[in-house]
Structures are given as structure tokens and as C-alpha cells.
A protein has these predicted regions:
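Hydrophobic alpha-helical segments typical of transmembrane helices
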Residues: 54-55, 77
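Short loop-beta-helix segment that forms the pyridoxal 5′-phosphate
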Residues: 60-80, 94
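Fold-independent oxyanion-binding glycine-rich loops
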Residues: 11, 29-30, 73-74, 94-96
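Short active-site-adjacent helix-start/loop capping segments
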Residues: 34-36, 78-81, 100-101
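Structural motif
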Residues: 24-25, 67-69, 89-90
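Conserved PLP-anchoring active-site segment centered on the Schiff-base-forming lysine
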Residues: 84-101
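Conserved small/polar residues in nucleotide/adenosyl-binding loops
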Residues: 103-105
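N-terminal "arm"/small-domain region of PLP-dependent enzymes with the aminotransferase-like
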Residues: 1-49, 55-57
Length: 105
């Protein structure tokens, strides 16, 4: 698949719920569970949802990677990156970051 086509269709799968060709945007916050702690892959949108899964698959496809990662907020992404750092590592950023990001860095 060429890059221009991949940017539109990369990582897409037919939505199993209703066989839609384009990924729907799931705006629900919670998902029904079969029993406590037993779900069909999703329980709460902030941690994981079908829309984010589709976005992560698209990112992975564009980068020819096995996995892609998306976060529910910019601060969550910054926190994940900071947790990968080791003592002595340096961070290069702009001085125009969200206030709490500056405190954490």
C-alpha cells in the first residue's frame, strides 16, 4: 500500500459491531460487562476504547510498526514519556508547555 493510501486506510478493519467500513467514533464512557471484571475488551473509555484502538492501529500502520500508542490527554502522554527516563537523561522542550507539564519536568 502506498503512503497516501495508507494515510487514509492504514490499520483499518471492518467494525465488527455493524460492519461499517469507516471506523465509527464511540462516545460512550462505560461498557456493559458480562459479570464483574469480565468484559469484551473495553470497560471504561479513559483507559481503552474502540476509537482509540483504531487510532493506534492507524499510527502503527503509518510507521510500519507492530504497535501504536495514543493517550486520553497530553499530560498522560507526557507522564508516560517521563517515566521512561533514567537519571541523567535530558529532555528538550519548548518553554510554552502546559503549566503542570513544566512542574513535572
Amino acid at each position: 500500500m502506498k503512503f497516501n493510501t495508507k494515510t487514509i486506510h492504514g490499520g483499518q478493519k471492518i467494525d465488527p459491531a455493524f460492519n461499517s467500513v469507516m471506523q465509527p467514533i464511540y462516545q460512550t464512557s462505560t461498557y456493559a460487562q458480562e459479570s464483574p471484571g469480565v468484559n469484551k475488551g473495553f470497560e471504561y473509555s479513559r483507559t481503552h476504547n474502540p476509537t482509540r484502538t483504531a487510532l493506534q492501529n492507524a499510527f502503527a500502520s503509518l510507521e510500519n510498526a507492530k504497535y501504536g500508542v495514543a493517550f486520553s490527554s497530553g499530560l498522560a502522554a507526557i507522564d508516560a514519556i517521563i517515566k521512561l527516563l533514567k537519571p541523567g537523561d535530558e529532555v528538550v522542550s519548548t518553554n510554552d508547555l502546559y503549566g503542570l507539564s513544566l512542574i513535572n519536568i
